């Protein structure tokens, strides 16, 4: 339901490890975790965006956070 996007800035980030953690621990789809050892972009559709943010915060600084309600978007509403 929620389109969750953010950037993680840190050290020794590993997109494969992040992908695996998401797959094993979060319900959702459309996962994209790309970047390098210092910056990873996350895109994920989930009903529990707060869990995604909590985990990502353990990896480094998170910013450019966007959480959009796709149900509202589908009905033509904003937010």
Task: Please annotate each region the language model reported.
Residues 1-79:
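N-terminal loops that bind phosphate or other acidic moieties
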């Amino acid at each position: 339901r929620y389109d969750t996007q953010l950037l993680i800035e840190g050290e020794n980030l590993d997109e494969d490890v992040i992908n695996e953690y998401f797959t094993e621990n979060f319900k959702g789809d459309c996962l994209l975790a790309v970047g390098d050892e210092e910056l990873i972009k996350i895109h994920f559709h989930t009903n529990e965006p707060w869990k995604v943010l909590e985990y990502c915060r353990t990896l480094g600084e998170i910013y450019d956070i966007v959480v959009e309600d796709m149900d509202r978007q589908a009905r033509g509403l904003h937010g």
